[in-house]
């Protein structure tokens, strides 16, 4: 038995592209009217800094879907040192020199666009 091969499903390229675009659009809708200060949350064991979380999810999209599968170079220099949850302890995430909210959202859009482009190219 090969779990990753035996249990799978198939989606069309168009469906995958729409899912990626929908996730990005929903995220942007949720944060569009927030001010920079509203992205800051107190240090709690159950949550991550919100701005860090946006960058982290984007970093994993980039790392797994673009860098590893597509052998592309990082779009954000140093992203691994900021957003890799395998390397960065939970409490340390609050003191990282993260990009601004606007820069984080721009990074998210660049990665989303590149993922869509990669999907449409296959």
Model-flagged regions — what are they?
Residues 57:
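Ligand-binding pocket scaffold of soluble enzyme catalytic domains
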Residues 60:
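Short Ser/Thr-interspersed hydrophobic loop/turn segments at strand-loop and sheet-helix junctions
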Residues 1-39:
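N-terminal regions that are enriched for targeting/export leaders
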Residues 25-49, 67-74, 117-122:
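Helix-loop segments that flank and shape redox-cofactor active sites
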Residues 1-15, 63-118:
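Short, helix-capping/interhelical loops that line the mouth of catalytic, cofactor-
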């Amino acid at each position: 038995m090969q779990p990753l091969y035996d249990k799978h499903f198939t989606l069309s390229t168009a469906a995958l592209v729409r899912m990626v675009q929908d996730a990005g659009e929903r995220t942007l809708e949720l944060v569009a009217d927030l001010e920079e200060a509203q992205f800051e949350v107190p240090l709690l064991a159950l949550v991550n800094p919100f701005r860090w979380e946006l960058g982290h999810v984007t970093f994993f999209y980039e790392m797994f879907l673009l860098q590893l599968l597509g052998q592309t170079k990082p779009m954000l220099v140093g992203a691994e040192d900021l957003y890799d949850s395998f390397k960065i302890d939970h409490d340390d995430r609050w003191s990282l020199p993260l990009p601004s909210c606007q820069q984080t959202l721009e990074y998210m859009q660049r990665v989303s666009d590149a993922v869509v482009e990669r999907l449409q190219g296959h």
